[in-house]
Amino acid sequence: MSSAFKAMRLHLTCPLPKQVINIPQTLFSYLITNQRAINNSCKPVKTSNAKKPKLPTTKLSWEERLSDTVTPLWRMTYEDQLQWKYEHQKKILLKMMKELSQDPTRAFSDHLNFPLLPIVASPVRDGYRNKSTFSVNKGIDGNPKTLGFYIGTGKAGNIVCVHADHLLSIPSKHKMVARCYEDFIRLSPLRPCILFDDGGHWREITIRTNSTGHTMAIVYFHPQSLTPEETDIHKAALVEYFTQGPGAICQLDSLYFQETTMTRCSHEQSQYQLLYGQTHIYEEVLGFKFRISPDSFFQVNREAAEALYKTVAELSQPCVGGTLLDVCCGTGAIGISLSPQMERVIGIELIEQAVEDAKFNAALNRVCNCEFLAGKAEVVLPDLMGSLSSDGGLTAVVNPSRAGLHYRVVRALRNHSAIRRLVYISCKPDGEAMRNFRELCCSVGLVRRITGEAFKPVVAVPVDLFPHTPHCELVLVFER
């Protein structure tokens, strides 16, 4: 055991929560001093002969280049960022109106004939992210066990992994956990998994935090040819590092581990294994408490999410009462937040774990008028619409991913005449969402099997959830 490690252990003052698994007393030091004996099939990482990336050809530092990649607006004042985003959203809406004006039977003009309200600023500008994923790859010094974000592309073969310590959007707690995980995998005898067919095991880490500082870490691991017993040794070492070793300074509340041979997979495809701590962390939004699982969707900026949900609630005020359809509902944040002003809320979500969280959240907050359904919206919604009563009216709120809504979802919404108002939340309105806008507003018969009355845009509000980046959420209201 190194003297530095002994010193850090002697000076740890953070309280250690109760462990979930039993760990051999001296396992971590055993791994450090006996790396080759753990798994003979895994060669220690050699960095002395690794090719180092060329220095930047410009005068920018690696840190500046990463900031320009991840947070391109970081050099601007926040007021200038908001103005830039407002003008960008205006251009997108003008593009939408130009496309809608091509419909020969609709009286759309090619200019903005509905109000674009002022952009809603984020209450917090720095360190706002409650979820960050740090990748593993070759660093500036050539070390393949470097945690951070990428500069370059795999296609060009010039990827460099740069530490994220300087990025404005990431909180210090996330940076601390990432640095500790980097330290751990550098001490481990297992190689990093950079390319699946090249072998290696340690992959990225995702860190989730809430506003009170509770922290969940999810470590991703490629088992390759390791036996379950061999993998268990490294899982135990990981737990010991974050509870009794230098990583204890992170004070993790939850430590999860996912073994997978795929780039991305759900909890259903490969179970998240709780190695240590609590099963969930919790966050409060607009007075409601929400449970967060390892893979459940939750807006990355809590304070700005509150502003977003308030905006959606205000734009839904004319339709108070009746039923709210919350499509792509995630953990139920929007539906539960709007539940006091609705008679009934029905949420639809693809990820089963998120639906379980949504149901739990409704019960936790004693909200009795919400129900949540798991499945693809394009499968669930058409059948659901036929069983809904139009008494009291129907309001739809849709919050899809960047892929937008499936055509069958739009068709079901269009063809149900009781829906008079639809609130569309998009983080990328100039992407696939633009197709949805056309489908919602096009003439009857112009798109296959759409027979319902067309919508028209009536008001738009940008909400900044992502300071220092070009992105924001656009809330666009359609009526008919």
Curated annotation (Swiss-Prot):
Q: Name one GO biological process term.
A: tRNA processing
> Which GO terms of the cellular component aspect does the record hold?
mitochondrion
PANTHER family this protein is in? TRNA (URACIL-5-)-METHYLTRANSFERASE, TRNA (URACIL-5-)-METHYLTRANSFERASE HOMOLOG B
What does the protein in this record do? Mitochondrial S-adenosyl-L-methionine-dependent methyltransferase that catalyzes the formation of 5-methyl-uridine in tRNAs and 12S rRNA. Catalyzes the methylation of uridine at position 54 (m5U54) in all tRNAs. Specifically methylates the uridine in position 429 of 12S rRNA (m5U429). Does not affect RNA stability or mitochondrial translation.
Q: Where in the cell is it found?
A: Mitochondrion
Q: Which InterPro entries match?
A: SAM-dependent_MTases_sf, TRM2_met, TRM2B_chor, U5_MeTrfase_fam
Q: What class of enzyme is it?
A: transferase
Entry keywords, A to Z: Methyltransferase, Mitochondrion, rRNA processing, S-adenosyl-L-methionine, Transferase, Transit peptide, tRNA processing
What gene name does this entry carry? Answer: trmt2b
Database matches in CDD domains: AdoMet_MTases
- Which reaction is this enzyme known to catalyze? uridine(54) in tRNA + S-adenosyl-L-methionine = 5-methyluridine(54) in tRNA + S-adenosyl-L-homocysteine + H(+); a uridine in 12S rRNA + S-adenosyl-L-methionine = a 5-methyluridine in 12S rRNA + S-adenosyl-L-homocysteine + H(+)
The UniProt similarity line reads:
Belongs to the class I-like SAM-binding methyltransferase superfamily. RNA M5U methyltransferase family.
Residues reported in the UniProt entry to bind S-adenosyl-L-methionine: Q299, E349, N399
Which residues are annotated as active site?
C427, E473
Q: Which GO terms describe its molecular function?
A: rRNA (uridine-C5-)-methyltransferase activity; tRNA (uracil(54)-C5)-methyltransferase activity, S-adenosyl methionine-dependent
Q: This chain belongs to which protein, by name?
A: tRNA (uracil-5-)-methyltransferase homolog B
**Which E.C. number(s) belong to this protein?**
2.1.1.35, 2.1.1.-
Q: Name one Pfam family in it.
A: tRNA_U5-meth_tr
